């Protein structure tokens, strides 16, 4: 709904595979190689037709924007192809705040909430991509935003830490 209000043409890639982050973090590099190459080949079929690829999730956007290029450090052709794609890859909050009128749209919506909210930065947003102010700027348009104490503290998820080292917590959470 928001993208329509911003009058953006949206294309949802139907054949995109997993970005490969879970495999990358656990050392399953044959899987990373397969997934990244298949995605690069698929993205290349339409990337010149779009201005940007916006990804709402920090780990996937960091994987595609930065880690694919790093992963292919010994495969120059694939590294170059990943680098070319990375120029159009953006985390959604960064692109929407910097390239659209979303902040004004939210501010003029007439919706102001009294709830006090805080925002925890995903590590792959703040520490890898430098994205931390953009989500706050957008949230402040409709909410009272209060920074949490020790906002740089790790949430404990750590890529696949929750699934491996803290399996009982993950299972209990569902």
Task: Name these PLM-found stretches.
Residues 1-174:
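Iron-sulfur cluster-binding electron-transfer modules in prokaryotic oxidoreductases
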